[in-house]
């Protein structure tokens, strides 16, 4: 299931997604209420640090979240089981049902990693290897979904 808004960037992405029976493309086609229901039906959330990630976390979904220079102490997803979020910036970390992937490229304005873009600029680069995300998702899926009776 792929979701997104109806802005130009998401609309362009929607055009690039192949038509396949196992891909449900809801980009630009869901209200917030509909997204809550779709998220509740999902097995996991894989995506950026967004409201959707926090919705999935509130529903105790397995989270694979991609962060840029965000201050994870403030914005990482809450683990209901642990009753906490993360407190450290690290390239890859897992706490209970949450795995975070964070870019380790320093902020061009202040040189910090995880400054949270406090300079009102959006000029950050990401150096997260997509393979590391795929590997973590595959490992979880094979251990928890495929092997379940």
Predicted regions and their residues:
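Donor-binding and catalytic core of enzymes assembling or modifying cell-surface/extracellular glycoconjugates
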Residues: 1-73, 79
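Compositionally biased, intrinsically disordered low-complexity segments
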Residues: 20, 148-149
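Nucleotide-sugar donor-binding patch of glycosyltransferase catalytic domains
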Residues: 25-26, 57-147
């Amino acid at each position: 299931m792929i979701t997104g808004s109806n802005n130009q960037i998401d609309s362009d992405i929607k055009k690039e997604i192949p038509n396949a029976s196992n891909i449900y493309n809801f980009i630009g086609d869901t209200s917030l209420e509909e997204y809550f229901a779709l998220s509740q039906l999902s097995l996991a959330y894989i995506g950026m640090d967004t409201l959707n990630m926090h919705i999935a976390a509130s529903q105790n979904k397995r989270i694979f979240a991609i962060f840029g220079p965000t201050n994870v102490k403030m914005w990482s997803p809450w683990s209901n089981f642990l009753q906490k979020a993360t407190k450290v910036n690290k390239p890859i970390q897992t706490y209970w049902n949450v795995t975070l992937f964070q870019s380790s490229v320093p902020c061009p304005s202040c040189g910090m990693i995880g400054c949270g873009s406090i300079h009102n600029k959006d000029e950050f680069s990401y150096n997260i290897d997509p393979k590391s995300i795929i590997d973590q998702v595959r490992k979880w899926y094979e251990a928890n979904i495929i092997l379940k009776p």
